[in-house]
């Protein structure tokens, strides 16, 4: 091949060509008789020298010659400018509002250790890095509003951080990031918050919805009874009996204020409802524990007064053991802040039509795909329902408990919540953690949020 043919080749292409030629030469050499090989090597050894006078060993000869030839041809290539490390010349503090479907992720928060599924923040950081909006997630003043667990979704999650800024050519952040993010994570707005803003501590209230159906195999929930019980959550209470204790945070104040608590109908035709809950802040697994108790009350396994009993820590000082409601129906629906004006993806007059259409089509595709799957599952349910009607329902002596997401838990005999075994007290759990870690009281930074 003439040397001019190599002029447009990249470094990787040249190396690949070298290896290809070397392989062919070795193959041809191996096919020669031993005496012929020895003769050729002797001739080559006597004739070929490197510029510095060092002999080329026969076993390396083919590679050296081909490499030398390729490098000579490559000398005619235009010299490329060295790539400079990417640096942020100017940054701006931005808050991003975004939505995500949680069932494909191992929760919101980025994890240093490997996880079975990716995390939402992991995907967001990947997009930010690919877009050259940040250089290092650990040095961009990052904060999140509400940490959601594996399987939990969000429609109004908020993060804040420093990102690249350009005055000469404004960056359309929503469009840039949504092009790089998975279809089930969408940036829905951004804002330039006031000084001192923190996505977590500046949040005034958080809004959750927990979806469920009224009917389930073997029973139906009493919605009026659940609404009556939900109203008992209103106000400020000690919710230590409605959460999972996280000893690493050394929380001592379990008081939280609930602003709104009710059961609402989402779709009368399908019997879909939601536990609609708003509060200033929430404890770990608090909403799922509150929902679990509402399920028991809706099934008439417990009285509505159970909520008052569990909120009275003098009467019930430690949490009775009970199962939380399933995680998948839970949604962090919105987060509310003062003095924040969100810029929507469609606020730019030049790009609004294109962005609006692309966003709608992306979300529509997800919705349509799930709708088709729902209908397929519905056909299967019809078959199962036909078999149940044909053979009749079996008489069972066990109790059935609805734990959300269409899941049922059966037990031979239902044990009332207040008659169950209790967990250890908050004080005992916190103290044991300190001893295990070798911490003193002065070393502990308690995380108490109201």
Swiss-Prot record:
Catalytic residues (UniProt): 149 (nucleophile)
Q: What cellular component terms from Gene Ontology apply here?
A: cytoplasm; cytosol; nucleus
Per the UniProt entry, the Enzyme Commission number(s) are: 5.4.99.-
Question: Its Gene Ontology biological processes?
Answer: mRNA pseudouridine synthesis; tRNA pseudouridine synthesis
Q: Which reaction does it catalyse?
A: a uridine in tRNA = a pseudouridine in tRNA
Could you tell me the keywords of this UniProt record? Cytoplasm, Isomerase, Lyase, Nucleus, tRNA processing
User: Main site of residence?
Assistant: cytoplasm
- Positions of substrate binding: 208
| Compartments, record wording | Cytoplasm; Nucleus
Q: Mention one GO molecular function.
A: pseudouridine synthase activity
Q: Describe the family membership recorded for this protein in Swiss-Prot or TrEMBL.
A: Belongs to the tRNA pseudouridine synthase TruA family.
Name-wise, this protein is Putative tRNA pseudouridine synthase C25B8.05
Native organism? Schizosaccharomyces pombe (strain 972 / ATCC 24843) (Fission yeast)
Q: What is the lineage of its organism?
A: Eukaryota, Fungi, Dikarya, Ascomycota, Taphrinomycotina
